[in-house]
Amino acid sequence: MKIKTFVIGLTLCSGYAAAEPSDKQSMNVIPQAAQLCVSCHGAAGEGIEPLGPRLAGLSKEYISTQLQHFQAGVRQNATMMPMAMTLQGDGIEQVSSYFSAKPANDVKPVIRGEQVVFNDDTARLAYQGDWSRGLPACVTCHGPSALGGGLFPRLAGQQASYIKTQLLAWQSGTRKGDVDGMMGSVANKLTVAEIDALANYFANLK
């Protein structure tokens, strides 16, 4: 009798375990707060040109901070400001956790020995900067493979049009909220041609 009871109990426990969703399934469930986001940014945060930039690969901290900036009016965009205002309670936490968990393709710089191979002036700006103009390398803050981290967003694989519009916004002063005014200072030292070239360079770095 005791043996039968044990078998029944084991069967019930096994059935319960099978019903538990896997981690992969949980990651694919779009939280309610993020459901408005996918129409412009894609269900996997892949971005939809020209509606919304890529969110996959951005850090949770960066996404959360930008949403707070939109809510406070520090960062202004006619579409994003009202969207951000819909995120109440733990809405920002849900959105930033969901999209930051989405995988992004790894980016590996072209390396010969210990030296990165620079093909042109754009790559030199990205990896070395131009200290004669007080321009640090983009990778100084955005990481050696432009994968970003913390308050610094991923650039590799981001839409060229988005990178360009944001650099121009920093340049004109219509985008703010950067740490110590760093991005505004950098953007103001770049020419229009350099902005265009850098945007295309990082967009194609995959």
Regions found by a protein language model. Name each.
Residues C13-A17:
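N-terminal signal peptide c-region/cleavage motif recognized by signal peptidases
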Residues A18-A34, E46-L51, A104-S132, P153:
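Electrostatic cytochrome c docking/interface patches
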Residues Q25-G73, N77:
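The feature marks the first
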